[in-house]
A protein has these predicted regions:
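Hydrophobic, membrane-inserted alpha-helices
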Residues: 85, 107-117, 133-137
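Membrane-helix boundary connector in multi-pass membrane proteins
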Residues: 93-98, 111-129, 142-144
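Core segments of alpha-helical transmembrane spans in multipass integral membrane proteins
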Residues: 37-88
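Residues within membrane-spanning alpha-helices of integral membrane proteins
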Residues: 3, 7-17, 76-79, 83, ...
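Juxtamembrane transmembrane-helix termini
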Residues: 23-36, 88, 92-99, 120, ...
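N-terminal signal-anchor transmembrane alpha helix
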Residues: 1-38
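Helix-coil boundary and interhelical linker segments in multi-pass alpha-helical membrane proteins
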Residues: 1-10, 88-99, 139-144
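Membrane-water interface of alpha-helical transmembrane segments
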Residues: 3-10, 62-65, 69-72, 97-104, ...
Length: 144
């Protein structure tokens, strides 16, 4: 039962990361999801660089809006890697998960961090998702 519970939690994390990445990629074509509600703000973001971009940016498209999209894509990748790793443990290496306090604590700690960040900065969908995923991971670890 514990591997199934871990797989459910991992699947939720994978879904959150993949969904975030897809919506971000769609925003590169037509901004709708992670764009400011005031279009003027996005246009202003397109007109400036970040303070860290001293001199010439790597790309001619280097601006705050593109940096924002890149951050969102790299953020998605991290979440997908976490969910994917947990799914591999659930489906193929559950014994390693069950026997390793380090793996269990890492899974709980990283997912907890995403939950806290979500509560502080995001909206209800990722908060609910990370909350349920965390509960699944904790239950799987307790049952292991």
């Amino acid at each position: 039962m514990a591997p199934i519970i871990l797989a459910v939690g991992a699947g939720i994390i994978l879904l959150l990361g993949t969904g975030h990445g897809v919506l971000t990629l769609l925003d590169t074509i037509r901004p709708r999801y992670f764009t400011p509600s005031d279009e003027g703000v996005r246009l202003a973001m397109e007109g400036v660089r970040t303070a860290m971009q001293h001199g010439k940016p790597v790309s001619s498209k280097g601006n705050l809006w593109r940096s924002w999209l890149g951050f969102n894509l790299s953020h998605s990748l991290g979440i997908v890697v976490l969910g994917g790793a947990l799914l591999v443990f659930a489906l193929h290496h559950f014994t390693a998960f069950a026997q390793s306090v380090l793996i269990q604590c890492s899974a709980v700690g990283i997912t907890s961090a995403y939950l806290v960040i979500s509560i502080c900065f995001w909206f209800w969908v990722p908060t609910a998702g990370f909350g349920v995923a965390l509960a699944c991971i904790v239950m799987a670890a307790a049952l292991a």
